[in-house]
Amino acid sequence: MSDSESSAISNNASDLNPSPGQENSMPQLETLISHLVAAKRSLSSINHVWRANEIVTAARSALEESVVVSARTGFLRRGLNNQLRLLYSVRTEVQEVSLRGRSEFATVLKSLDVADARLRKTLDLLRDTIVHASFRPEGEESKTLHDFVDERGVGELHTTLKRSIDRTNAAQADLESSNRAFDDELQSIKEALGNYRAATQLASSRTSASSSSPSTSNDSLPSLSSIPSMLHSLEMHAQEMANLLESLVRHFDLCVTAVKHTEGGGAAARSITGDVPATVHVNGRVGPNIEEGINANLNAPLDPLSNSEYQEMVSVLIKDAAEAEDVVMEIQDRIGEMETVLENVLAQRDSVLSVYNATTSVFKHLSTLASTRLSGYIAEAHSFTRVWHEEYEQIQSGLADLSDLNTLYDGFLEAYDGLILEVARRRQVRHRVEKVLRDAKQKLDQLYEEDVNARETFRVEQGDYLPSDIWPGIGREPMRIEFRRISGGNLKGIAAEPPDQDAAAAEPKQEARAVSSGDVGEDGEVIPELPKALVEEAIARFNARMRHLP
C-alpha cells in the first residue's frame, strides 16, 4: 500500500461540506463503513506478526544448539570412520570371495547343464531313432541307434562331475556358514550403523532440500550453512510483515477519518473501532500502538477538509481498499513461508541430534567386536578359493568330455541319415543300371531277330544254288549276347572280407528275389528298399544341419 493516504488528509483545510452534486458522485456512508469494517478485520493480521516474532526466536535458539551438537558429532565421526572402514573392508573382501565364487560356480553349472542337456537330447534322439528293419538280419528284434552306444563312459563322467560339484558345494556351504557367523557378530553394529546412516541421510536430504548446493555424500555430516540464511530470511519476513501491518493501520486510520467526515459517520466509527488490538513487538522493535492511535483519532476534533481534499482522501481510500486484501494475503503467505522455514530449521536441528545419538550408539557397539574371529573368517575364504580352483579345472575337463561325447553321438545320428541317403542313392543307381540293361537287351534281341530272319530269307532264296561246302557258316544262327552280374569286392582302403558263401552259390542267371525287404542281385549285393517318407525325413534333417553350419 502507498503512503499517499497520509498526505491526502490536510490539517489546514477549511471545513466545507460536499455540495449536493458532489454527494451524488461520492460513495455512500454504507460503502465507507464497509471499507472500515474490512480494514478493521485486516488488523487481525497482528497475530501473524506476533507469531513471526516467536518464530525468529525459536530459529535462533535452534541454530545455537545445532552448532554445538554438530561440533561434538564431527569429533566422534573422525574416529568412527577409520574403525568402520577397516571392519567393513574385511567383510566386503570376504563377501566378494563368496559372491565371485558363487557367480563362477553358477556359470560353470549353467554350462554343464547346457552341455548335459544337449548330450541327453542327442541320446534321446538315438533312443527314438529305430534302425529300419531292412538294415538288419531277417527275424531280428527291432533296434534303435542307442543299442549300438555304450553309455558307461557317460555314467563315469557324470560321477566325476558330481564329485567335483559336491566338494565345491560343501566348501561354499562352509564359507556361507562362516559369513553368517560374521554377520551375527556384526548385526548389533549394523543395526546401530543403520540408524546412524538413516539419520545422516535424512539430515543430508533435508540439508540438500533447503540448500542450493546438494550434499556430496549421503554419509556426510549435515551442513548447517543453510540455517543462518534461513534465519536471515525469517528476520526479513518479520520486518516486512511489520511494515505491511503499519500500512494496514494507516489504511484503517484513513477509513476512520473518512467515515467521521461523512455525515452520520462519527457514531458508527466509534462503534466499529471499540475492540482493536494493541501493541506488537517485532525483533526488538516496537510496532504501532493501534488502540491508542485509534482512540486518539476518534476522540480528536475533526480537522476541516475542503471538498477537493475530501474527494482526494476518499479516492485514496477506495484505491487502498482494493489493495488491502492483497496486503493481508501477503502477510498470510509470509507467515506460512516462515512456518515452513522454521520446520526446516527444527528438522535440521533434530537431524543433527539424531546423527549425534546414532554416532554414540555405534561406538558402544564397536566395543563388543574386540574378540571377533576375523582371522578365522579370512582363513575360511582362502580355503574356499583353494578348493574352487582345484575343482574348476576338473569341471572344465569334464565339460570338454561332455562336448566330445555329444559330438560323437551327434555324428552317429548324422551318419545314419547319411546311410539312408546312400542306400537311396544306390537304389537309384541300381535302377538306372537295370534300365540300361533292359534297353540294351531289347535292342540286342531285336537285332538278333532281324539277323535270323535275314539269314533264313537268304537261305530260302539262294541256298539251292550254292553248294553246301562253299562256306560252312552259311547255315548257322547269329551269335547271342548274355549279361552276367559279378559280385563287387571291397572298396579301396577296406580290408578284404571272406566271400559270402551264399552269394557264391547263387546261379549266375538266377532272377533277383526279395531278401529282408531289399533287392539281392545275381552279384549277391543287397540294397534295402526304404520307405519314401524315411528318405524324405533324412533329407530334411540333412538340410537343417546344413543351414546351421557357420
Curated annotation (Swiss-Prot):
Membrane-crossing residue ranges in chain numbering: none
Bias (Low complexity) ranges: 495-507
Statement: the UniProt record of this protein carries the keyword Cytoplasm: yes
GO function terms (MF aspect): molecular adaptor activity; protein kinase activator activity
Listed GO CC annotations: Atg1/ULK1 kinase complex; phagophore assembly site membrane
Residue ranges the record marks as coiled coil: 317-350, 427-457
Region (Disordered): 1-25, 204-224, 492-527
Pfam families, per database record: ATG17_like
Highest taxon above the source species: Eukaryota
Membrane topology value: Peripheral membrane protein
Function of the molecule: Autophagy-specific protein that functions in response to autophagy-inducing signals as a scaffold to recruit other ATG proteins to organize pre-autophagosomal structure (PAS) formation. Modulates the timing and magnitude of the autophagy response, such as the size of the sequestering vesicles. Plays particularly a role in pexophagy and nucleophagy.
Family: Belongs to the ATG17 family.
Membrane as UniProt keyword: yes
Record-given protein name: Autophagy-related protein 17
Organism: Aspergillus oryzae (strain ATCC 42149 / RIB 40) (Yellow koji mold)
InterPro entries in UniProt: Atg17 (IPR007240), ATG17-like_dom (IPR045326)
Keywords tagged on the record: Autophagy, Coiled coil, Cytoplasm, Membrane
